[in-house]
From Swiss-Prot:
Belongs to the short scorpion toxin superfamily. Potassium channel inhibitor family. Alpha-KTx 29 subfamily. Has the structural arrangement of an alpha-helix connected to antiparallel beta-sheets by disulfide bonds (CS-alpha/beta). One of its GO terms (molecular function) is toxin activity. Disulfide bonds join 32-51, 40-56, 44-58. Coiled coil: none annotated. This is Potassium channel toxin alpha-KTx 29.3. Weakly inhibits the Kv1.3/KCNA3 channel (1 uM of thetoxin inhibits currents by 13.2%) and Kv7.1/KCNQ1 channel (10 uM of the toxin inhibits currents by 27.7%). It is found in: Secreted. The lineage of its organism: Eukaryota, Metazoa, Ecdysozoa, Arthropoda, Chelicerata.
Amino acid sequence: MKSVCGVLIILVVLTTMLSISTFSTVGAEADCPISEAIKCVEKCNQKVEVCEPGVCKCSG
């Protein structure tokens, strides 16, 4: 049972790291909160040009 918990923790950590790196590659600024970045990515279909608190601009 402990090994299952360990695998789940590793998966959560890897998923979090991947999502953070994905947000940085779609143009989300460092000062853009994760919640705001998620909204921008959904709104712009992952084509985010500018992401700041309260500001979300899509590219193309």
